[in-house]
Regions:
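Domain-level signal for Mg2+-assisted phosphodiester chemistry and nucleotide/NA-binding surfaces
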Residues: 1-92, 99, 138, 147
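Nuclease catalytic cores that cleave nucleic-acid phosphodiester bonds
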Residues: 69-190, 194-196
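Long, low-complexity, intrinsically disordered segments
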Residues: 192-210
């Protein structure tokens, strides 16, 4: 097996897990994905998030654009952005999880990778990972201990525990830690709040959750 790796990043989940566990979010994505690949060839990295509304949150939109500009300069990384809709007057993500799961399965079906690494603790992705396994693919999960579903751990062939030690040397040079903010904003139905980088918040998932 050639072990071509495709990395799928739940941007909301990663942003808030970094903020809560490492108190900073200025991640060097090239070094991060290289460490996950561990010498295996990278097919491509896909980053998923919601596009901020410049009319509702102009500051958040500006900060997100700066963040996305950095991402788009990362080799072999594609940004996938979903939209927002109002739910009981509150903006929520629209279609991000479906977009990620569809890409993961579509690329598996077309044999574009041998190993899928999903950077998320969201148990909603467990079924997609199992389907990829059924196609003969290896699936790995990169997660924070405070934000992982048991179903994800059960389905994964291999697991990457993310913590402060893992991220040593993976931060972007010359940037200071961004202070935590508590502003309200667009969310997923189960993920209240938002981030300065434009990533809606992810609720912590108990390791006992299925």
């Amino acid at each position: 097996m050639e072990n071509r790796v495709a990395i799928f990043i739940d941007g909301s989940n990663l942003y808030h897990a970094l903020r809560d566990n490492c108190s900073r979010v200025d991640l060097n994505f090239t070094d991060f994905t290289s460490k996950l690949c561990a010498g295996r060839p990278l097919f491509r990295t896909y980053y998923y998030n919601v596009l901020q509304d410049p009319n509702q949150r102009p500051e958040g939109f500006r900060e997100q654009q700066e963040f996305l500009d950095v991402l788009k300069k990362t080799p072999y990384l594609e940004v996938r952005l979903g939209g927002m809709k109002l739910s009981q007057g509150v903006p929520v993500e629209k279609g991000i999880d479906i977009m990620l799961a569809t890409d993961l399965l579509h690329f598996a079906w077309n044999n574009l990778y041998d190993v899928a690494i999903l950077v998320s603790g969201d148990g909603d992705f467990a079924y997609a990972l199992q389907a990829a396994k059924n196609m003969g693919k290896h699936v790995e999960v990169a997660y924070f201990e405070s934000n992982i579903s048991k179903s994800m751990l059960d389905v994964a062939d291999n697991r990457h525990l993310l913590n402060q030690e893992f991220f040593k040397g993976l931060w972007r040079a010359g940037l200071k830690r961004r202070p935590r903010r508590g502003r309200k904003g667009p969310r997923r139905p189960d993920r209240p709040a938002d981030s300065p980088a434009g990533a809606p918040a992810a609720n912590s998932v108990s390791p006992a959750e299925t």
